[in-house]
Amino acid sequence: VDLSKKFGCTPEQALPLLQLAQAKGIKVMGLSFHVGSQVPHARRHVQAINACREIMEQAWDLGRKPWVLDIGGGFPVDYEGGEFDIDGFCAPIREALAKLPATVQKIAEPGRFISAPAMTSVSSVMGKAHRGDKIWYYLDDGLYGSYNGQLYDHVTYPVSTPYAHGELHNAVLSGPTCDSVDVIRDGIMLPDLAIGELVVGRVMGAYTWASASTFNFF
């Protein structure tokens, strides 16, 4: 997810901005960057840290004292249920940060990594239809609700029906709105679900209800 289009500056613009801030009496505490969301490897973090280190060194040579570096977030979450090696991911980041003077305060903001596993969402089947060779189940939550990350973040949340058993059928889990894009999962094999049956979504603590709407009054 690109977060750099609307805000920020290029590394080449940073030092002139620091000089402009000093000329206007603005005290700059440090530098910050954000490499995006769900970054698969730490290469971008390392590149950004190295760029900030060069900017800070130039600023120090000119007598300016930026002493805080905020490396933002971007630490990924494994939505497939595997064990993500966060120590391995952070190793090159720690190595790059170690090249900064000890006086530089380092800040990280791993929001998704911390919050995503903290929430499990439970929805219920409010409608059912046989359409072609699939059974459609209409839930009371969907892509305009807590599953909106499938649109915004390209995330596929793990879903299950822990209380339903029996022969599996080709099915669709749909949200409740009129929009045809409001489909949580198409082609999922599920046992026969009754109205009121519960569907569980996991790893849903990040950017779910915070980005939800009330479209179609749901």
Residue ranges and their predicted role:
Residues 92-94, 103-218:
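Charged (often Lys/Glu-rich) extended helix/loop segments that serve as interaction or gating elements
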Residues 7, 33, 75, 84, ...:
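Phenylalanine-focused residue identity feature
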Residues 1-68, 92, 96:
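Active-site-proximal beta-alpha core segment in soluble small-molecule metabolic enzymes
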Residues 4-14, 38-50, 79-88, 112-118, ...:
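Active-site glycine- and acidic-residue-rich loops that bind
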Residues 38, 43, 49, 76, ...:
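Alpha-helix termini
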